[in-house]
């Protein structure tokens, strides 16, 4: 992404302004502080979708329209924001924050998902999370921990900002979780198929046994009995097929019911264990009577040792047990009804000795057809089992491959992180290659993807914050799955000496400014510390940020059809 231009319209005070930017380094310059630099930068990233925690006291965004022109993958878009309503140039209707966040992720070709604090379920991340790694706020980014408590929007997510950076660096485990969920589903489906095959084979064996006792019909007057044979054969065959189906359904449902009851029993034991907090309590399998530890039950049921999770699954299984029990009752009733009809046909056949031969013929033929149908069903289930096993093999290979790729990538990034810690220490401590005492600035308190509170005070603390931000900007430049223009508001929060300022600006110029677009606020007095200052685009902010004579011209940009 590249920011081309930015417009502000204050419709209450009838003031406006427009700013144009370049693709490289953009310096927001003023002669002193409180001249509007922060208002400009905060408003720009607010328009992009970052919910800024606080604006300057004299900057009331409730009476302002903001519009930013950006280039994403060589396509230009206009993004307009007023409070929590967004308009984008390629969508006709206004968007809320959630809809805009989805639009932004789609344009950046990413899929960032974060876990909700309460439900632990994954949701598509809001735009504030997408922008967070690239924006350093003047007021909220320089205290506590890096990238923490910068916006209230992110309080809904767990493990922030670590999970955001894992997603940005393609280190997130959520891809693995999706594959593992698919693997679990396929494995469960395979187990169901295996159970179905077993049930079918049992029914088939019963039919073969029954069919062996049926006498073979050798002589039948087909011409005389043709109509009766066709009629009774069709009736008998249809009813027997229905009986087979209901037997199969009953066997499958009973198998599922038994499994659900077993899982319910184990869950009840787990809940008791969880409440009593026993470390190792055995429970007994209701079928094989083997002892199951709490961990084995948790593993078999694919659960973590969480009381609420176990309780929720127990409720779901109890509902499933009731549902299966009711279905079995219905199927038994329907089967009994059909069997009554078959008995009625048998009674009619037996009433006439002339139809005895037909009765034997119908029974033998119907049982043969039922046996063939069962064999066909077994073949289909065996094929389904084979296909599922192949899918499981493929998924396991993908999971193992992805695990290795992520582990390897993390090792590479961690090595770069360690190297950057050493390099930036040298710059900020003003050390040469022969002086190896790096004790002046301690950057060893945070490992890669650790975002704990940073110790220290005064300029020492400022230097630590700056160093860690520069480390992550360097890593973003090299490993991020997407790029948003870098932004760093003023980092000088305390008195600073000339030499210290020189080293800090040297580090910024080396590790923050680069070929990608960046925005940096600076007072004109400190421009002398930048070696390549003449090559940077400067936006001078003096006096009032907004002016009346630009209002009518810029207001035309905010005319919407809808």
UniProtKB/Swiss-Prot annotation:
Disruption phenotype: When this gene is missing the Lamassu type I system does not confer resistance to SpBeta in B.subtilis. One of its GO terms (biological process) is defense response to virus. The keyword Membrane does not apply. Keywords: Antiviral defense, Hydrolase. GO terms for molecular function: hydrolase activity. It comes from the Bacteria. Component of antiviral defense system Lamassu type I, composed of LmuA and LmuB. Expression of Lamassu type I in B.subtilis (strain BEST7003) confers resistance to phages phi3T, SpBeta and SPR. May be an ATPase. This is Lamassu protein LmuB. The gene is lmuB.
